[in-house]
């Protein structure tokens, strides 16, 4: 730990430098506390994360952070100060900036009441942070609405959006067995559920679910049990229902981002460029091409709000914190492969049966023709 802190910009902060430490929340990675840290001649609100398994797997965590340190200068990544140690448990804790408006999931009811320009600006900040991660050849690996944070200083008109928990999932996943799955099901790409590695494209899939939340005001699949059945449905192409009155250009981008084939999804840079075009000329529509003008007018004319027919109450087995799932990717793949095999045989059987029927009908027709009595009097055939 000492060598790591010496080599990086991170700090070792003695625990007695914190005051007013209080429990804040429990997340997928561990327990979260809020505290006041007197630093640079002023009080700073910070978060202390008591990370599950961090002390037992410190080397893995530090190695991961050597790579992720390059993202700390991004204005869209929550700032990571360093480490401390709980004197009672002797466990290491991560010290990070505190976002005073909570996470995106807790702000969805407010987001849905925003106009499209505000929504697009928020999405632009989120995808900018994701792009900052990807251009360093890194992957978030646990991107969901609980890791998108809102902060607002008293003098700001709107919230600043940050991405958090970058690099915190690797130490947890090092404890998993070969076929274990860890995460939040609705935000996990099909290929990840099936046991493949995380890639930038799997982060983009997660971003598509956040895009959908901006149209619905609720988390994806909140009315379903987050179990193997939902995972199977996601792998077979099921996605959240498109919300009425969503601008078509937005729907098309969202669908590209959640494509079942990872190679068909756009990169974070491509998504960033598209959203930037939607935002930049918002107040000067006359000076842009017809297609972009049409798209922007869609956003301007779209009603604010969401479909009142959506179920806003969550299912009792809907879980939106990262967790070890109670089924494995091996089980998931076995069921999917079995279904594919059944569908193949069913298709073969159906086409074969159709051919048999057609051949049978042709045969019967020939028999009937051959059995018809032929008149010996040709006059019988004349009209």
PLM ranges: what are they?
Residues 134-151:
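Catalytic-loop of the protein kinase fold
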Residues 122-123:
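Activation segment signature within eukaryotic-like protein kinase domains
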Residues 31-52:
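Glycine-rich ATP phosphate-binding loop
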Residues 79-92:
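Short beta-strand micro-motifs within the conserved protein kinase catalytic domain, predominantly
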Residues 89-103:
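Conserved short submotifs of the Hanks-type protein kinase catalytic core
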Residues 241, 258-270:
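A conserved short helix/loop substructure at the end of the activation segment
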Residues 203:
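Conserved catalytic-loop aspartate of Hanks-type protein kinases
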């Amino acid at each position: 730990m000492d060598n790591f802190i010496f080599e990086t910009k991170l700090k070792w902060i003695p625990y007695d430098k914190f005051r007013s430490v209080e429990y804040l929340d429990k997340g997928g990675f561990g327990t979260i506390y809020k505290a006041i840290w007197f630093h640079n001649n002023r009080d700073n609100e910070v978060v202390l994360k008591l990370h599950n398994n961090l002390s037992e797997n410190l080397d893995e965590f530090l190695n991961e952070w050597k790579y992720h340190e390059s993202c700390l200068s991004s204005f869209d990544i929550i700032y990571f100060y360093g480490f401390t140690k709980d004197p009672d448990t002797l466990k290491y804790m991560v010290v990070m900036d505190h976002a005073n408006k909570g996470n995106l999931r807790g702000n969805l009811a407010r987001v849905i009441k925003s106009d499209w320009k505000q929504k697009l600006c928020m999405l632009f900040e989120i995808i900018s942070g994701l792009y900052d991660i990807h251009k360093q050849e890194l992957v978030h690996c646990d991107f969901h609405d609980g890791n998108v944070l809102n902060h607002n200083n008293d003098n700001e008109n709107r919230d600043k959006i940050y991405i958090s928990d970058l690099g915190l999932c690797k130490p947890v996943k090092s404890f998993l067995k070969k076929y274990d799955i860890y995460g939040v099901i609705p935000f996990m790409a099909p290929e990840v559920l099936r046991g493949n590695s995380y890639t930038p494209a799997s982060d983009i899939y997660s971003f598509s679910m956040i895009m959908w939340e901006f149209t619905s005001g609720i988390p994806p699949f909140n009315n379903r049990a987050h179990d193997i059945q939902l995972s199977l449905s996601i792998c077979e192409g099921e996605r959240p229902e498109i919300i009425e009155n969503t601008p078509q250009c937005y729907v098309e981008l969202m669908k590209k981002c959640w494509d079942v084939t990872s190679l068909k999804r756009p990169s974070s840079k491509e998504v960033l460029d598209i959203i930037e075009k939607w935002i930049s000329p918002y107040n000067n529509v006359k000076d842009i091409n017809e297609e972009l003008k049409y798209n922007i007018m869609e956003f301007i004319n779209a009603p604010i709000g969401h479909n009142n027919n959506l179920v806003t109450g969550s299912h009792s087995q809907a879980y939106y914190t990262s967790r070890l799932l109670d089924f494995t990717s091996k089980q998931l793949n076995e069921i999917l492969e079995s279904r594919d095999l059944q569908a193949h045989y069913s298709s073969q059987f159906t086409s074969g049966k159709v051919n048999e029927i057609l051949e049978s009908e042709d045969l019967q027709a020939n028999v009937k023709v051959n059995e018809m009595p032929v008149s010996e009097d040709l006059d019988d055939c004349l009209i």
